């Protein structure tokens, strides 16, 4: 069935900027907490009950818990395999078992998604929004669902309630496919604004599909009036149950110029069904004049909520709290990754934190009940201008992290350690904006950094010769990383020692997945050019070989 946007899209009023404490003053005073918090029950449309009651937990997430049943491995987004035979003693025996060619092409490669592994099947989506079900053991095609709609990525699919859920990128639709056959069950248009798109994999929980729009698509990004919005859809029918506006409809007084917000990666979900989303940046970044008069940009608006915020929502989409990680963002320093939920044992009193990260080059631990920041760790290269709120007239400054840099792909967590993939690519800004000629992915380097979840201190750090943009993926005492040089690398979780590597021959620009004795690597063939900032920028030098999904297995 199909759900029309006119029928289901509900209007939201301006985002409320009132700030108030979500716990009693006595409780916060006793704990010594003083977070920057905000909440309003009016920030989301009221939720309706799903048409057909579905179990809270999608059965597949429990049934395939030992595989890789969600985009980030589990609903806490920890990116750690739960029952894999791949460890430091077997990783050197990994060998290519099969390859599955991907024909789609884009400036970001043929794929940017994390594969889903569930039972006998691997599910992936290419950069034209097409979905493939592949036999886990042989790499043979089971079914294919074609949409041929461009996207910027990262995209991807989610599994639940007998269906595969995904989106059509530029077409701004969410769809549900029968997981066994690939036949479309429903499709819903999220936005009638052609300046917006969808560039993320959803998560599925509580009878809902959780997904977001972003302020752009493959044609252009950050055009005036483009906004990111979070959605909860009925997983059975596609009906929009609630939506949460991540930016004010009035866009800080200049809707013809400003844009921003939305999410690029799926939210984390706690045991109570609360949602944790990282929200992207405001725009534009360059000075703008209207009729000769400088205007206030979204990126220079001091309270440009909820951009660059960690936002926690109730299951029905109402706001619990937010943490503003990067107000007054003039460098596109998103807080755009999937938050990761982890437990800290504070002298026998454990509490949960959401680990947020993004292009600002920081990992931030935020307590999930109150929204109080516990610690912040800078990672990768930083210059003195990284937190600047203005650039002196006539000056040019080097900014690191750059507009494409910092934590560009998802982090992982296991056994008290946070694993952070890093892209180092400084750029030059002046008082007129970004100097696009300095954005060259050929000059990028990478790192993989291990942090102690207790306090954010560095346990170890290793350097990579190219940008590390394929996330971090943990299997027992091994952590995998992939870089733009096309090499898959496996490191010891203990000290960062390199254990194994494999040259795929193409740029790696998508996260891996691990299940049992299988490592699945999307060899995307990336030739990165950041069209959003600099169409003339130098692409990363990679092979002309096409993209492929590669299945590695431990050889006997």
Predicted regions and their residues:
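Conserved blade-register residue in beta-propeller folds
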Residues: 133, 176, 232, 312, ...
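Repeat-blade elements of multi-bladed beta-propeller folds
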Residues: 65-75, 107-130, 149-174, 197-223, ...
């Amino acid at each position: 069935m199909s759900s029309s946007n006119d029928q289901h899209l509900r209007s939201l009023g301006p985002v409320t900027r009132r700030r108030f404490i979500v716990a009693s003053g006595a409780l916060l005073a006793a704990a010594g907490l003083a977070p920057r918090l905000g909440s309003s029950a009016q920030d989301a449309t009221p939720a309706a009950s799903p048409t057909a009651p579905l179990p809270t937990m999608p059965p597949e997430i429990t049934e395939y818990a030992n595989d890789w049943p969600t985009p980030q491995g589990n609903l806490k987004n920890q990116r750690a395999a739960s029952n894999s035979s791949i460890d430091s003693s077997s990783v050197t025996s990994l060998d290519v078992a099969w390859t599955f060619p991907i024909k789609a092409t884009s400036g970001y490669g043929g794929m940017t998604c994390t594969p889903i592994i569930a039972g006998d099947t691997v599910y992936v989506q290419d950069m034209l929004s097409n979905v493939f079900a592949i036999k886990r053991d042989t790499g043979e095609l089971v079914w294919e669902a074609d949409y041929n709609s461009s996207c910027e990525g990262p995209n991807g699919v989610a599994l639940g309630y007998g269906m595969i859920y995904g989106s059509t990128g530029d077409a701004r639709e969410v769809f549900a496919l029968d997981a066994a056959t690939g036949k479309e069950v429903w499709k819903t248009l999220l936005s009638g604004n052609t300046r917006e798109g969808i560039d993320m994999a959803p998560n599925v929980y509580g009878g809902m599909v959780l997904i977001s729009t972003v302020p752009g698509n493959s044609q252009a990004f950050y055009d005036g009036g483009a906004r990111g919005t979070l959605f909860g859809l009925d997983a059975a029918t596609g009906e929009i149950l609630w939506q949460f506006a991540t930016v004010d409809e009035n866009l800080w007084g200049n809707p013809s110029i400003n844009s921003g917000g939305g999410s690029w990666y799926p939210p984390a979900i706690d045991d109570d069904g609360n949602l944790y989303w990282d929200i992207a940046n405001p725009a534009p970044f360059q000075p703008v004049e209207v009729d000769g008069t400088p205007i206030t940009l979204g990126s220079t608006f001091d309270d440009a909520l909820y951009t660059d915020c960690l936002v926690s929502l109730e299951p029905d989409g109402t706001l619990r709290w937010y943490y503003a990680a990067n107000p007054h963002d003039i460098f596109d320093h998103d807080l755009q990754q999937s938050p990761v939920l982890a437990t800290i044992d504070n002298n026998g009193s454990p509490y949960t934190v959401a680990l947020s990260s993004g292009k600002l080059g920081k990992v931030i631990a935020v307590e999930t009940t109150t929204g109080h920041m516990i610690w912040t760790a800078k990672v990768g290269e930083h210059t003195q201008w990284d937190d600047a709120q203005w650039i002196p007239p006539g000056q040019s400054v080097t900014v690191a992290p750059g507009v494409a840099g910092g934590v560009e792909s998802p982090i992982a967590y296991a056994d008290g350690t946070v694993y952070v993939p890093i892209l180092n690519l400084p750029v030059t800004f002046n008082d007129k904006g970004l100097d696009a000629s300095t954005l060259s992915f050929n000059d990028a380097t990478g790192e993989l950094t291990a942090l102690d979840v207790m306090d954010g201190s560095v346990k170890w750090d290793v350097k990579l010769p190219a940008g590390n943009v394929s996330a971090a993926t943990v299997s027992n005492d091994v952590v995998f990383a992939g870089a733009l040089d096309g090499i898959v690398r496996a490191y010891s979780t203990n000290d960062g020692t390199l254990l194994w590597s494999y040259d795929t021959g193409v740029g790696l620009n998508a996260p891996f997945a691990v299940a049992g004795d299988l490592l699945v690597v999307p060899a995307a063939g990336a030739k990165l050019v950041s069209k959003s900032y600099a169409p003339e920028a130098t692409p990363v030098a990679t092979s002309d070989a096409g993209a492929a999904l590669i299945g590695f297995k431990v050889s006997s």
